[in-house]
Amino acid sequence: MSENAGQARSRQTGVPAQAGWGKQFVKFSFYRVADAVRQGPQEARLELGKRLASLLDRSAERMLTRTYSTVGTRADTDFLIWQVSDDLDEIQRWHASLLASPIAGSLERPHSYLSMTMRSMYSNPLHDGAPKRDTLRDDGGTNDYLFV
């Protein structure tokens, strides 16, 4: 991880580096369960599910986290983890913990995308809905589908 001046200042003040007003980081991570795990004993698959659920619970405590099944829609992935945070370091820390966990070798990650939302320079602050557009999501929505 490279360090820029903003990150250095955040370490001095103890305040986490954040995207700034009206910006959020959005991470789309597609995973596939390894064939060896899929063909292995049911107990091993159940243990993988429990450990992954525990990691996802920790992610949800720190940032907006949703999972979506891609079974039947993509041949190269099984599920998507969608994370939204004001703090990019938080996303990186979570992914580092996943890669350091015992389940890392059981998952393949064929696709991984990072984006950043940004308030439009054309938005009208006098418009009734303007304050609600400052963040991507703050309602913790539970839509069944997410199109990437």
Located regions from the model:
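Short, charge-rich binding segments
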Residues: G72-T73, E90, I103-G105, D138-G140
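Short S/T/G/P-rich N-terminal loop/turn motif that feeds into the first structured element of a domain
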Residues: M1-A60, D86-E90, Y113-V148
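Short gly/ser-rich anion-binding loops that grip negatively charged ligand groups
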Residues: V71, V84-S85
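Serine-centered coil/turn micro-motif
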Residues: A36, S101-P102
